[in-house]
Amino acid sequence: MPHTARATATAGPIPRLITIGETMMMLTPEHAEPLATASKLSLHPGGAESNVASHAAHLGIPSAWVSVLGEDVLGRRIRTSIERHGVDVRWVTNNPDASTGVYFKDPGRGVLYYRRDSAASRMGPSTVASVPLEQAEIVHLSGITSALSSSCADLVEAVFERVAGSGASLSFDVNYRPSLWRAGAAAPALLSLANRADIVFVGLDEAQSLWDCVTPEDVHAILPDTGRLIIKDGDVGATEFSAGTRAFEPAIPTEVIEAVGAGDAFAAGYLSAALRGDPTAVRLRAGHERARLVLLSTSDFIAEPVPTQTSKI
């Protein structure tokens, strides 16, 4: 494995929420227009798990994000930006032998990724060796990480093994990305991980692609033992199965500018409410409220703490 520089960990309270996963530099049109004709682009960090940590931090939950970045200007910018959101980045490291990944948002048309052999794709179990996962209340990661590389899949397995049996709960967002792996390979791997998690987030559309599920009940049938199973159905709403009960909360009517990142915002809103001890309906509503803010923006995140954080290119 290439040498990876360790971050200097400073002493401090263990965050209630620890997230683990890749973050790239995202370039997005400043306005809701196609990438092909946009004249101004903005730079923002973009990554499922750092998004969750940033949203949760803005909601008052002490949160940390763990990852590996390149030893480059983009990596330094990402770390600084996420830290300014109030996220604990003491366990973020830099790999001098690999670059930070980049991706472009094309509003309404998808995303273009440039992440091959990125620093984060070289993460492995050693990435979390010094992270006190067992002392957090919730550890959150997603299925994206498993698809990045074999060492990243080993990282996910190590996290699951360490959190199992500890006082922490394991939160897992299925986050299936067809651009990273085919459904034939992803379906059994993601189902196995979801069955071992305490809290699972999955979109009904991705459950259909992966496991031929048509209804929330179909998803519950293949994940019957999950402590809290949250199934998101776009502009319809979200269903939670927990403690032998089923609850549904309708989505908030919203004019969607860009959907990418809304799932991360939902997870953060839900987890923050769960850490506050809120009941099911409040948890689901908190997820919808946070997701709505992202749906109204071209960014994965909202409420930038420093106006100058966005640079035009």
Question: What is each stretch, according to the model?
Answer:
Residues E30-K40, L141, T245-T254:
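Glycine/charged-rich beta-loop-alpha catalytic/anionic-binding loops adjacent to active sites
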Residues P62-G143, S311-I313:
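Conserved N-terminal subdomain of the carbohydrate kinase-like
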